Amino acid sequence: MYIIFVSVFVPIVLAAVVPAALRRAGFAEERRWRWWLYAACILFWVSWYLPSPLIEGRDTSFTTHFVGGGMFTGLLWYYVKQSLGWRSRWPVELFSLFALVSALGCVNELVELGAVKAGISRLTLEDTNWDILANSLGVLVAYVGYLLVGRWIDRPRR
């Protein structure tokens, strides 16, 4: 039940709250880029139902973190970046992306700890390092995708 709740609740809240917050802050252009947010939310939802590999003989949530952590964050970052009209050099963009995935990963691990301690879920908390690696690799794949495709999308039109 925990997985179903999180996989549905988080994307719905994000899809409602983030655009409203950006519009309230005066970024009316966010609507133009909103499909990236919706794609991120769908990716997050799907990630909960993908199989993950055994690592060192233990069941992990590696794929969930790779897709629903790292790649999701990459799409969310791109949506926010475009909505804000923010551009920078690639090292600054990459740093901002890793800062975002790290912050969201930290929040996720705290939620997992809280769910375990409250008896809501029976997760093993021993795979945190693998979760960090999966999030980082997923966001790196998303950034490479951005470099290959996103910059082409961003280029000024004539």
Description of each model-found segment:
Residues 1-126, 137-158:
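Bulky hydrophobic segments
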Residues 131:
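Divalent-cation-assisted or electrostatically stabilized phosphate/pyrophosphate-binding catalytic cores
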